Amino acid sequence: MLESEYHKSALARVMKEVGVDSPVKAPRFEKVCLSVGLGGASSDSKLLASAVEDLSLIAGQKAVVTVAKKSISSFKLRKGFPVGCRVTLRKRRMFDFINRLLYMALPDQKDFKGFTMRNFDGHGNMAFGLTEHIVFPEVDFDKTYRIIGMNVVVVTTASTDQLARILLSCYGFPFRD
């Protein structure tokens, strides 16, 4: 739904607000990266399996397990131990996820008042965290091993944060200020 809206009305609004004459020059979504960090995943294999399964349900494609790059003795972490999982969404799955995020997950999120400019990284990308992954309708609360948080990064082709904010607000991302 959001992808067809992108190609119809939102692209025209973005072009008008940014001030470009060609759709190729207009900023657009590139990818959405979802990641889950699990500190105790090396000692609890059921937690890792549950996180991979839940993230795969949310994203619509299989999540990849991330491993530690180096050993850190104070964290009882060895090189190669699993520490989380991640998935990168592009094209159709990206727009499906954004649609579910905006219209199903964020309205159910506790104390969510909108995004701010602090969510941007200075290069036109927006990152934020969700404290509970069970706000997505695909995840069954009864089958979840433990409630986990997740990081979401929306990568755009915009060169500045202002252009990215225009793009995201044209698609319905709520902003506070």
UniProtKB/Swiss-Prot annotation:
Keywords: Ribonucleoprotein, Ribosomal protein, RNA-binding, rRNA-binding, tRNA-binding. One of its GO terms (molecular function) is rRNA binding. Disulfide bonds: none annotated. InterPro entries: Ribosomal_uL5, Ribosomal_uL5_bac-type, Ribosomal_uL5_C, Ribosomal_uL5_CS, Ribosomal_uL5_dom_sf, Ribosomal_uL5_N. GO terms for biological process: translation. Signal peptide: none annotated. GO terms for cellular component: ribonucleoprotein complex; ribosome. This is one of the proteins that bind and probably mediate the attachment of the 5S RNA into the large ribosomal subunit, where it forms part of the central protuberance. In the 70S ribosome it contacts protein S13 of the 30S subunit (bridge B1b), connecting the 2 subunits; this bridge is implicated in subunit movement. Contacts the P site tRNA; the 5S rRNA and some of its associated proteins might help stabilize positioning of ribosome-bound tRNAs. Part of the 50S ribosomal subunit; part of the 5S rRNA/L5/L18/L25 subcomplex. Contacts the 5S rRNA and the P site tRNA. Forms a bridge to the 30S subunit in the 70S ribosome. NCBIfam families: PRK00010.1. Belongs to the universal ribosomal protein uL5 family. This is Large ribosomal subunit protein uL5. The lineage of its organism: Bacteria, Pseudomonadati, Pseudomonadota, Alphaproteobacteria, Rickettsiales.
